[in-house]
A protein has these predicted regions:
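Walker A/P-loop phosphate-binding element recognition
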Residues: 1-93, 100, 104-113, 131-132, ...
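Short, polar loop motifs at secondary-structure junctions
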Residues: 113-119
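Short amphipathic alpha-helical segments
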Residues: 96-100, 124-127
């Protein structure tokens, strides 16, 4: 994506590899974001009011309890080149405005989310992960899904023989 892109959602069904891809992105981009890349698992969160505290904790903010957290968080993140990787946000999509508030309050922050559902925010760029195609007759040895299956089957049993009737 372009340098101006600030919010990317890796979208796909459960188990497709969204979190794995996010982990690879983390490893690759650590040097690009001089103030840090923070992987923040959000699967356990169920309430909107848990979003800002989870991000504050992950990024090292020690909030002043008598002051509202959002302005403290935006001040803490503001001006820093940070990538927030927010993993498993699908149960929080109704509260996507919290993510927009972070982007608005901390203009140099970038966010990558993983989700089964879109956030439906205006500037969201969606990167969809889909499964491999399966041939209708199941006999296409050149098909990616069949080739992957055969590779693992042969790894498990090197003596396995495969023919067109298998």
């Amino acid at each position: 994506t372009q340098a101006s892109t600030r919010l990317v959602t890796v979208l796909g069904p459960g188990g497709i590899g969204k979190s794995t891809l996010a982990g690879l992105v983390t490893a690759r981009l650590r040097g690009v974001f001089s103030d840090g890349v923070f992987e923040i698992p959000l699967a356990a969160l169920t309430q909107a009011d848990q979003i800002f505290p989870a991000i504050a904790d992950a990024t090292g903010l020690k909030p002043i309890s008598e002051k509202p957290l959002p302005p403290q968080l935006f001040g803490h993140l503001g001006g820093k080149r940070i990538l927030l990787i927010l993993d498993n946000v699908e149960q929080l999509t109704e509260n996507a405005q919290h993510f927009k508030a972070i982007l608005d309050g901390a203009p140099s922050v970038r966010i990558l989310t993983t989700s089964r559902e879109r956030l439906n925010l205006q500037d969201e760029v969606v990167f969809r992960l889909d499964g491999l195609r399966v041939p209708a007759d199941g006999h296409d040895g050149n098909n990616e899904s069949v080739a992957l299956f055969l590779r693992y089957a042969l790894r498990a049993n090197p003596l396995l023989t495969v023919d067109d009737n298998a």
